[in-house]
Design a protein with these regions (language model features):
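Conserved post-catalytic alpha-helical subdomain immediately downstream of the catalytic base
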Residues: 192-197, 202-207, 211-213, 448-504, ...
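Charged helix-capping and loop-helix junction motifs
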Residues: 31-33, 59-63, 150-160, 218, ...
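Conserved phosphate/ATP/ADP-binding segment of small-molecule kinases
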Residues: 59-132, 346-426, 430-433
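Active-site/ligand-binding-proximal alpha/beta "capping" segment
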Residues: 129, 134-215, 414-433
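Charged C-terminal helix
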Residues: 216-218, 224, 228-257, 261, ...
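Short glycine/threonine-rich catalytic loop with a Thr-x-Gly-x-Asp
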Residues: 173-177, 210, 431-448, 468, ...
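Conserved N-terminal beta1-alpha1 strand-loop-helix module at the mouth
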Residues: 2-92, 98-99, 107-134, 168-171, ...
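Ribokinase/PfkB-type carbohydrate-kinase core domain
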Residues: 40, 244-364, 368, 372, ...
């Protein structure tokens, strides 16, 4: 989908939208110098926003800015003030919810003027559609110091939901509020509708205006936007026409790769399972680091192969927030295991906060946990366990959740269901003793994290515009297969007489797992 629009024969490119803010200029930097550098760096549309000056000064600044914008063939819009826009023949206006109504502004402005409005929720989007505006400014997507916010933060997942409503319209959408080079890729990947509609641009004040080098700041934002546009349409899908044989071969190869790579797998997990998760990691040929302090997350994010965030006893939320942010920044897979998320309001709110802060590569849970995450009441949970027979159509459910959260979703149970939003895989391995020991679900999360680390580390092709390289669907399938096949082999051993002997045997079978065993025992079906 093109990020530009044709109005009055003019092509409007919203990809990098500068909103001015003279009060944020660094000491010694002149406003016009900063504006020209940002235009050189790739700003494609400018809005003059002056909140605390009189009319004469607003008009002067707008006219001086217009000369530069004309030089770079960039449209100029005026924030709030129709009179200023008319007086200087601006290309259009940006209106807030309490400014001049769109229908009246349209009557006053010359035909073909660009009209954009601020939207903070779905109702405002619906009104903007009725008003046939040219674009919407959705915000604030993150917290910002540039302006005191009077409406709730939308967050990236909220932007995606609002974009769903713009499907089938010609209205363009930019996000605004707290966007900077360090969160831009995350912002873009998170802000996509379930049908794949992405943002047409980003509107930025401080990351450009506050920079001593606005040319470089703008160029960096432009580059990230372009790389995102050039990347594959979903963040993790590799778009291979998956077949059971292909997946089996990939899972087997990943096991061999991981024994060579020996990735470091960081796990923020719960005390109940920490020991057995670390042992499972080692048994597969990876190295565990069970680190949860926020202060160490940045350093670790450079050296880890993947990060597992397991909710379990949820004491380390700050570490989880910071860890996921840095993992995204350094393009390391994040595996999210929202243990017992349906159990309390605190857990539900924490899951939302985490998923609004970083993007998971894989979300893994049982039917009850994933239902709670998706705010579906089709399946109920009791504590950390799922209750009842599960979803009527589990394949459809995981596919939809994968599209909404833009990641791979793994739903564990007697049958495991995995989807990247395009393909749905059904796995039928596993022994019922897994349900009788504590932490087997958490160990699945660990195994998925181990194999996703291998998938990311051994990825042949890297796309700058993706949050993570490598085939996360195959990584997730391989992780589930490893534990479930090992459970079948362990349960069949003559030295296993109950749950007490099953757990060490399970670790043994993970240790002795081979590519040939995966090929021999994996029960895989591609169902959609
Ligand atoms: C692109 C874009 N989106 C939103 C806004 C916010 O406008 P508004 O709601 O009018 O608030 P103020 O900017 O007037 O504080 C914007 N300016 N640009
Ligand atoms: C002007 C403005 N409008 C917002 C909204 O939410 O409508 S947020 C915002 C400020 C954006 O500045 P920065 O890029 O420095 O965070």
């Amino acid at each position: 989908m093109a990020s530009h629009q044709i109005l009055n024969e003019k092509v409007i490119d919203y990809s990098l939208y500068l909103v001015t803010g003279r009060d944020l200029l660094p000491p010694g930097k002149s406003y016009l110098e900063s504006l020209e550098q940002s235009l050189k760096g790739g700003v494609k549309i400018v809005q003059i926003r002056e909140k605390s000056v009189d009319t004469a000064e607003f008009l002067k600044v707008a006219r001086e800015s217009q000369i530069l914008c004309k030089k770079y063939k960039v449209p100029i819009l005026i924030n709030d003030r129709i009179d200023i826009a008319l007086a200087m023949h601006a290309d259009g206006v940006h209106l807030g919810q309490t400014d001049m109504p769109v229908s009246i502004a349209r009557g006053l402005l010359p035909k073909g003027s660009i009209i954009g409005v601020s939207c903070n929720n779905v109702d405002e989007i619906k009104a903007a559609i009725k008003d046939r505006v040219d674009y919407v400014g959705i915000g604030a997507v993150w917290g910002t110091k540039t302006k005191e916010l009077t409406s709730p933060i939308v967050s990236v997942r909220g932007v995606g939901e609002m974009l769903n409503h713009l499907n089938g319209t010609h209205i363009k959408a930019v996000a605004i509020g707290g966007i900077k080079a360090t969160n831009l890729l995350r912002t873009l990947h998170g802000s996509v509708s379930t049908s794949g509609r992405a943002l047409d641009g980003i509107a930025v004040v401080s990351d450009i205006v506050g920079s001593k080098d606005p040319l470089d700041a703008s160029r960096r934002l432009c580059d990230i936007f372009r790389e995102f546009r050039n990347a594959l349409p979903t963040s993790v899908a590799s778009h291979h026409p998956y077949t059971p044989d292909y997946i089996k071969a990939s899972a087997s190869r990943l096991l061999e790769d991981l024994k060579l790579i020996n990735p470091l797998v960081q796990q923020i997990t719960n005390i109940v399972v920490a020991n057995q998760s670390a042992n499972a990691t080692l048994a597969l040929g990876a190295s565990p680091i069970m680190a949860s302090a926020p202060e160490e997350m940045e350093d670790l994010s450079h050296v880890i192969g993947s990060l597992l965030v397991n909710f379990g006893t949820i004491k380390d939320k700050e570490g989880m927030l910071v860890g996921g942010h840095h993992a995204n920044l350094n393009k390391k897979p994040v595996i999210f295991d929202p243990v017992g998320v349906g159990a309390t309001r605190f857990r539900r709110a924490a899951a939302d906060e985490l998923l609004n802060t970083w993007q998971a590569s894989v979300i893994k849970g049982n039917a009850g946990e994933l239902a709670a995450l998706a705010k579906s009441d089709e399946v109920k949970a009791k504590g950390v366990d799922s209750v009842g027979t599960g979803f009527a159509d589990p394949g459809r459910f995981v596919k939809q959740l994968a599209l909404t959260e833009r990641c791979v979703v793994v739903m564990t149970g007697p049958t495991d269901w995995i989807s990247d939003g395009v393909t749905v895989v059904r796995l039928d391995n596993g022994n019922k003793l897994l349900a009788d020991i504590t932490g087997s679900g958490c160990m699945v999360g660990t195994c998925v994290a181990v194999f996703c680390a291998a998938a990311a580390s051994s990825a042949v092709q890297r796309f700058e515009g993706k949050l993570v390289s490598g085939d996360m669907l195959c990584g997730a399938v391989a992780g589930v297969l490893a534990l479930t096949i090992a459970s079948e082999l362990a349960a069949a051993r003559s030295d296993v007489r109950g749950t007490g002997t099953f757990l060490p045997a399970l670790i043994d079978e993970l240790y002795n797992l081979t590519a040939a065993k995966i090929q021999q025992y994996a029960k895989i079906e591609v169902v959609g």
